[in-house]
Amino acid sequence: FSATNDAFDSNCNLVINGGKVFASGYGMPEGGLDCADESGYRLFINGGEVVAIGGRHSTPEKQSRQPSVQWRLDKLEDGKTYGIDGVSSYKSVRAYQMGGATLLFSSPKLKEGKSYTLSIDGEKKEQIESLKSPTENVGNMRMGFPF
């Protein structure tokens, strides 16, 4: 958890092979998971339960062994529960506004190519397909603030 920076900032290749990872970073340009991809480093998610929230994240590589889903939200409200079809959920511990927030879930329960629905406090919002590298398919939730 970081109140002012990236939550998990490796500055080198970042490989997650298992366990439970919860990374809550600051808003733009900071994020939950940062491997310094702008410098050529890469993020691989091969296993485990991963929830990352922040302004932006490094995007998992296509060579990752486990799929992820990722949404770009105009805002994220404090105290709300964000979940995907009973696979994983996250209860927000702070609000993200104006710069928006990116929410990433990865779990061995996700199946590549299957569509999942983001819900907020149990209300279904938007469906998106899971991919090993979700850059190509990021859901956009317009919730009050323009990008």
Regions found by a protein language model. Name each.
Residues 1-147:
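A composition-driven surface/loop motif
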